[in-house]
Amino acid sequence: MQPPAFYVTGTDTGIGKTMGSTALLHALRARGHTAVGMKPVASGCERTPQGWRNEDALALQAASNPQPAYATLNPYALPAPLAPELAAADVGVTLSLEPITQAFAQLRAQAEVVVVEGVGGWAAPLSATLDQADLVRALQLPVVLVVGVRLGCINHARLTAAAIAADGLQCIGWIANEVDPQMERVEENIGMLRQRLAMPCWGRIPWRPDAEAAAQAQGLQLPR
């Protein structure tokens, strides 16, 4: 059964969590659902007349229907492109769960499904006292893992899946996102991932860097 919200994490930073998240939003919308994205913490923002804005969070906003207010979608917009703990310290901000849980509740009231995108890889902390696992527990979310398909991805995927399970949380699916156009034997690597990951594969996003998120969504097969 389709969960009303889930948390998207990745095998590392830069492996396409946002691509996976926006594709999920479009796939959900194609099924007739209202679906909105959320980026609780984003580091690496640009100053605009409307305030600090993050490229990934804006992509989630554009892929959402209805489109939520930016401050609700991205409660913590941190200027420096650093680990959240460092980026928050640079501007004297202490990250806490309450603003995130309040924003999440607002998004849940606006749409049938909320796609929450995490930061970096699973073990990347949010603050000195807050891990992503703490946030996922607070929001009571299952996890979807985006696997960046490149050399080393089998090790990274298995380690990430094991870490999620060790935190007592449920990973309900994974997405293969091709990030290296030079990688050899992609099909075999994805086949090995299918054999070794306990959760089902929700589809594959091919290497098409200029493709729109709606087109990338065509490679996904979400559970009913």
From Swiss-Prot:
Which pathway does it serve?
Cofactor biosynthesis; biotin biosynthesis; biotin from 7,8-diaminononanoate: step 1/2
| Primary site of residence | cytoplasm
Write down the chemical reaction(s) this protein catalyses.
(7R,8S)-7,8-diammoniononanoate + CO2 + ATP = (4R,5S)-dethiobiotin + ADP + phosphate + 3 H(+)
* A Pfam family that the UniProt record links to this protein: AAA_26
- Subcellular location field: Cytoplasm
Positions binding substrate in this chain are S43
Q: E.C. number, please?
A: 6.3.3.3
| Record-linked InterPro entries | DTB_synth_BioD, P-loop_NTPase
CC annotations in GO: cytosol
The GO annotation for biological process reads: biotin biosynthetic process
Q: Which cofactor does it need?
A: Mg(2+)
Q: Name one GO molecular function term.
A: dethiobiotin synthase activity
Q: Which residues bind ATP?
A: D56, E117, G118, V119, G120, N177, E178
- Residues in the active site? K39
- Outline the subunit composition: Homodimer.
Cited function? Catalyzes a mechanistically unusual reaction, the ATP-dependent insertion of CO2 between the N7 and N8 nitrogen atoms of 7,8-diaminopelargonic acid (DAPA, also called 7,8-diammoniononanoate) to form a ureido ring.
The name under which this protein is listed is ATP-dependent dethiobiotin synthetase BioD
Q: What organism is this sequence from?
A: Xanthomonas oryzae pv. oryzae (strain PXO99A)
Recite the lineage of the species: Bacteria, Pseudomonadati, Pseudomonadota, Gammaproteobacteria, Lysobacterales
